[in-house]
Amino acid sequence: FGSLLGICLLTQIITGLLLAMHYTADTSLAFTSVAHTCRNVQFGWLIRNLHANGASFFFICIYFHIGRGIYYGSYLNKETWNIGVILLLTLMATAFVGYVLPWGQMSFWGATVITNLFSAIPYIGQTLVEWAWGGFSVDNPTLTRFFALHFLLPFVIAGLTLVHLTFLHETGSNNPLGIPSDCDKIPFHPYYSTKDILGFALMFILLVSLALFSPNSLGDPENFTPANPLSTPPHIKPEWYFLFAYAILRSIPNKLGGVLALAASVLVLFLLPLLHTSKQRSMTFRPLSQILFWALVANLLILTWVGS
């Protein structure tokens, strides 16, 4: 899935650049500029649908990638793993600021709710939130800085990806048995490069099918209404890929406790290399660990379902 993540990033940067050419980062124009892109720009609708659904595929791939890393003990490549977790955090930040840009109802209220979480930080919280907003509520300054961040962060992700690969290159990649595979090494090209094309093709078929047949199935219908600070939508919820974290946040009655639990749900990945106690690297021959692993997967799926 690593190669798929790379191609996801490339696709998102290309479609994003094309969208940025037609986008206006201003509260009075953002929503109409997105509508204009979809109606009047050649293939604008397609570019936007690919970009919006490409984000979903990015997260599908990264969750599979992390799951596989946990299952096969890849986290023992500590540097690679830690940079991977930082990549995940950067991706989540990018997706969040990007979701605010169309300036629909859910964009606005999502931004309000999530940035408000920073106010739970003792002592500096409120100052921090007003500093992030550039005022006393989510408004024009917030939108413009979010656009700047959404433009910048994908390139940060690309840079971190290179570091991620450099550290991976130090040790070589892992395998399902978790044993050294030096004797089985083969040239990357044409073998792996050809194998990766199959994954690219399958993912593109799925992505294009989704973008062409039901482009709005993963989005929130509230976002077809321009942002209105005076009317709160009945259910504020993020895109599906954040629902597990949002469910954790909402399930804890205390604000600071919820924020800490939400942060911990992702940051716990940093602890995995320290918590590995088995003599074997991979879970292939560890049925007990397998049960725990699949329980974790089931938990995440249930949280995602509950969160919606």
From Swiss-Prot:
Domain of life: Eukaryota
Residue intervals passing through the bilayer: 1-21, 45-66, 81-101, 146-166, 194-214, 256-276, 288-308
GO function term, MF aspect, one: ubiquinol-cytochrome-c reductase activity
Binding site for heme b b562: H51, H150
Residues reported in the UniProt entry to bind a ubiquinone: H169
Pfam families for the chain: Cytochrom_B_C (PF00032), Cytochrome_B (PF00033)
Cell location: Mitochondrion inner membrane
GO BP, sorted A to Z: mitochondrial electron transport, ubiquinol to cytochrome c
Cofactor note: Binds 2 heme b groups non-covalently.
Amino-acid positions noted as binding heme b b566 in the UniProt annotation, renumbered to this chain: H65, H164
A single Gene Ontology CC term: mitochondrial inner membrane
Keywords, ordered alphabetically: Electron transport, Heme, Iron, Membrane, Metal-binding, Mitochondrion, Mitochondrion inner membrane, Respiratory chain, Transmembrane, Transmembrane helix, Transport, Ubiquinone
Required co-factors: heme b
Membrane-topology annotation of the record: Multi-pass membrane protein
Family: Belongs to the cytochrome b family.
Protein function: Component of the ubiquinol-cytochrome c reductase complex (complex III or cytochrome b-c1 complex) that is part of the mitochondrial respiratory chain. The b-c1 complex mediates electron transfer from ubiquinol to cytochrome c. Contributes to the generation of a proton gradient across the mitochondrial membrane that is then used for ATP synthesis.
Assembly notes: The cytochrome bc1 complex contains 11 subunits: 3 respiratory subunits (MT-CYB, CYC1 and UQCRFS1), 2 core proteins (UQCRC1 and UQCRC2) and 6 low-molecular weight proteins (UQCRH/QCR6, UQCRB/QCR7, UQCRQ/QCR8, UQCR10/QCR9, UQCR11/QCR10 and a cleavage product of UQCRFS1). This cytochrome bc1 complex then forms a dimer.
Further comment: Heme 1 (or BL or b562) is low-potential and absorbs at about 562 nm, and heme 2 (or BH or b566) is high-potential and absorbs at about 566 nm.
Protein name in UniProt: Cytochrome b
Protein source organism: Baeolophus inornatus
Source species taxonomy: Eukaryota, Metazoa, Chordata, Craniata, Vertebrata
